């Protein structure tokens, strides 16, 4: 039986990707549909996508598929044709093409089977995830932004909202999508007469969130078709004003796509205008934070003096320190609380209801 997972080191794979000469296209897509056997589907996809030289991250569950990938430009149409024919539910699948792309977003293919393609924490058997809000296209989004009865709700994480969002969009103060869902209902409970517009990066979170709002008695619910990525692309193509301000955070090596020239965030170390995310170079930390070029040089890519000193230690000493920390210091934990603790950033004031 063939090996259906990667067995080459990340370092080697990254070097191979960087040495490639053919341009790559970064694509995201998702689809809610019933997958009877996610593991068998995963294995079949692995074989086909490996042949197409696809890199990236794909999650499968009984509720559907969620993918962020890169593919050689010459294979984009072959990938589209393969997916359209792979399952009837994928016929006509929308590809969200990256707005800014150097082709270096991924260097390894990972396919994982999960309980859900979006961790929503919903265990209500009466919830119908297919009963979603109506789609909004780019022109409709701009019209809604000018409608005083419309409320835009950002269903992304705090670090995504911080660097870019729609004008006057409501931030839901929670560290995870599963925590945002009940908070969104709570914050809008007294405003069921409002028109609610949900949005996220590529559409997968806001689609489910729109169904959750309808499940909780909200009737005027929309979500942006294809999320921020598709909105910005279509608005530019149609010559419409792009009303998203700042940068769109993305979950790959790029960490962001510039949507407007506005820089609305600040360096977490010195406070200078900046919207460049990075991970602390100390392997015992890897805190996700915003760092300007000056502080990157001053702190050698680390988030604090303590991490600078630890990063200077011999690798063996660093490993011993990491092993002695409870839960590995919660590496890759992106919670606002951890960011505030590490960098002394005060907790934001609670978002106001509309």
Swiss-Prot record:
<feature type="domain" description="Rhodanese">
    <location>
        <begin position="146"/>
        <end position="240"/>
    </location>
</feature>
<keyword id="KW-0560">Oxidoreductase</keyword>
<dbReference type="Pfam" id="PF17773">
    <property type="entry name" value="UPF0176_N"/>
</dbReference>
<protein>
    <recommendedName>
        <fullName>tRNA uridine(34) hydroxylase</fullName>
        <ecNumber>1.14.-.-</ecNumber>
    </recommendedName>
</protein>
<dbReference type="InterPro" id="IPR022111">
    <property type="entry name" value="Rhodanese_C"/>
</dbReference>
<keyword id="KW-0819">tRNA processing</keyword>
<dbReference type="GO" id="GO:0006400">
    <property type="term" value="P:tRNA modification"/>
</dbReference>
<feature type="region of interest" description="Disordered">
    <location>
        <begin position="315"/>
        <end position="354"/>
    </location>
</feature>
<feature type="active site" description="Cysteine persulfide intermediate">
    <location>
        <position position="200"/>
    </location>
</feature>
<dbReference type="GO" id="GO:0016705">
    <property type="term" value="F:oxidoreductase activity, acting on paired donors, with incorporation or reduction of molecular oxygen"/>
</dbReference>
<dbReference type="InterPro" id="IPR036873">
    <property type="entry name" value="Rhodanese-like_dom_sf"/>
</dbReference>
<feature type="compositionally biased region" description="Basic and acidic residues">
    <location>
        <begin position="315"/>
        <end position="328"/>
    </location>
</feature>
<dbReference type="Pfam" id="PF00581">
    <property type="entry name" value="Rhodanese"/>
</dbReference>
<dbReference type="InterPro" id="IPR020936">
    <property type="entry name" value="TrhO"/>
</dbReference>
<dbReference type="Pfam" id="PF12368">
    <property type="entry name" value="Rhodanese_C"/>
</dbReference>
<comment type="similarity">
    <text>Belongs to the TrhO family.</text>
</comment>
<dbReference type="InterPro" id="IPR040503">
    <property type="entry name" value="TRHO_N"/>
</dbReference>
<comment type="function">
    <text>Catalyzes oxygen-dependent 5-hydroxyuridine (ho5U) modification at position 34 in tRNAs.</text>
</comment>
<dbReference type="InterPro" id="IPR001763">
    <property type="entry name" value="Rhodanese-like_dom"/>
</dbReference>
């Amino acid at each position: 039986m063939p090996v259906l997972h990667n067995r080459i080191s990340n370092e080697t794979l990254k070097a191979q990707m960087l040495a490639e000469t053919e341009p790559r296209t970064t694509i995201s897509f998702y689809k809610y549909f019933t997958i009877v056997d996610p593991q068998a589907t995963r294995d079949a996809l692995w074989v086909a996508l490996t042949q197409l030289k696809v890199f990236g991250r794909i999650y499968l569950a009984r509720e559907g598929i969620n993918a962020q990938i890169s593919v050689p430009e010459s294979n984009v149409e072959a990938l589209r044709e393969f997916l359209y024919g792979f399952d009837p539910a994928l016929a006509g699948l929308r590809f969200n093409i990256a707005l800014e792309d150097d082709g270096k977003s991924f260097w390894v293919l990972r396919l994982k089977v999960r309980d859900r393609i979006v961790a929503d924490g919903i265990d209500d058997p009466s919830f119908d995830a297919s009963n979603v809000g109506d789609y909004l296209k780019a022109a409709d989004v701009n019209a809604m932004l000018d409608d005083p009865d419309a409320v835009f709700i950002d269903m992304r994480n705090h670090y995504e909202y911080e660097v870019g969002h729609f004008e006057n969009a409501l931030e839901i103060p929670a560290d995870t999508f599963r925590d945002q869902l009940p908070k969104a209902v709570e914050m809008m409970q007294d405003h069921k007469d409002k028109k609610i517009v949900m949005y996220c990066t590529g559409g997968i979170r806001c689609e489910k969130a729109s169904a959750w709002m309808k499940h909780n008695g909200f009737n005027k619910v929309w979500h942006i078709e294809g999320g921020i990525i598709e909105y910005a692309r279509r608005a530019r193509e149609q010559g419409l004003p792009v009303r998203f301000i700042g940068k769109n955070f993305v979950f790959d090596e790029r960490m962001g796509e510039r949507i407007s020239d506005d820089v609305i965030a600040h360096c977490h170390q010195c406070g200078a205008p900046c919207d460049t995310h990075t991970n602390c170079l100390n392997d015992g930390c890897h805190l996700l934070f915003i760092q300007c070029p000056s502080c990157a040089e001053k702190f050698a890519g680390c988030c604090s003096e303590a991490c600078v000193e630890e990063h200077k230690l011999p690798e063996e000493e660093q490993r011993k320190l990491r092993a002695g920390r409870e839960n590995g210091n919660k590496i890759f934990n992106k919670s606002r609380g951890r960011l505030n603790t590490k960098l002394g950033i005060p907790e934001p004031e609670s978002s106001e209801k509309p």
